[in-house]
Regions:
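Positively charged n-region of N-terminal signal peptides that target proteins for export
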Residues: 1-4
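Bacterial N-terminal signal peptides
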Residues: 7-25
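Sec-dependent signal peptide cleavage junction
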Residues: 20-32, 152
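Short, glycine- and small/hydrophobic-rich beta-strand elements in well-ordered beta-sheets
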Residues: 27-39, 68-98, 107
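Acidic/histidine-rich, surface-exposed loop or edge segments in extracytoplasmic proteins
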Residues: 37-50
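Short amphipathic alpha-helical segments
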Residues: 52-77
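Short amphipathic alpha-helices in soluble, non-transmembrane regions
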Residues: 58-62, 112-121
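C-terminal partner/receptor-binding element of secreted or periplasmic proteins
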Residues: 118-155
C-alpha cells in the first residue's frame, strides 16, 4: 500500500502541473539565452547539409537584414566585424563548412543568430519558418574558439 501511495504521489507531482492553467505561458515568457563572447576574436564553424546551403545563406541574409535594421548601437558594430566564409571543398560526409569570424567582438552584444533575427521579425509564423530553415540546414555546430589577439602581423 505504501508503494502504491508513493507512485500516486509521484504521478500527481508530475502530471498535475503539466495540465495546470498557464503552464505553457511559463516557457513563452522566458527570455532567450544570449550568446556573448569575452575574447577579442571569435571563430565559429558550422557543418551545413549540402542540399541546404541556399537555406543557410537565406538565414544569414536575414541576420544581416535584422542587424542592419536594428536600432541598437552595437548592431552596427557587430555587422562591421562579422565575416562568414564558405569552405570551397565539402567534408568527407558531403557537408559544407561555414566559418564565422568576428573581429573585433562587441562586448555584451548578443551574437545568437536566431535572437537577432527574432528581434526584427515579429510574426510568429515567419519566425518559425526561419527557424525551421536554420534547423534543417544545420548538420552540426563544429566549434567556437575565442580569445585575445596574440600577434597582429600586419603591424
Amino acid at each position: 500500500m505504501r508503494r502504491l501511495s508513493g507512485v500516486l504521489l509521484a504521478c500527481a507531482m508530475f502530471v498535475v502541473p503539466a495540465f495546470s492553467h498557464g503552464h505553457g505561458d511559463l516557457f513563452a515568457q522566458t527570455a532567450p539565452n544570449k550568446t556573448t563572447f569575452t575574447g577579442d576574436i571569435v571563430v565559429m564553424a558550422f557543418a551545413i547539409n549540402p542540399d541546404k546551403t541556399a537555406d543557410y545563406e537565406k538565414v544569414i541574409a536575414s541576420l544581416k537584414d535584422a542587424l542592419s535594421k536594428s536600432e541598437a548601437p552595437e548592431a552596427k558594430q557587430q555587422l562591421a566585424g562579422w565575416k562568414i566564409i564558405k569552405n570551397a571543398m565539402p567534408n568527407p560526409d558531403g557537408s559544407i563548412v561555414y566559418i564565422h569570424i568576428i573581429s573585433p567582438v562587441v562586448k555584451n552584444a548578443d551574437y545568437s543568430i536566431m535572437n537577432n533575427i527574432y528581434a526584427a521579425v515579429k510574426d510568429p509564423a515567419e519566425q518559425k519558418a526561419v527557424f525551421d530553415m536554420y534547423r534543417g540546414a544545420m548538420k552540426a555546430p563544429l566549434f567556437v574558439i575565442q580569445g585575445p589577439m596574440v600577434a597582429d602581423l600586419s603591424k
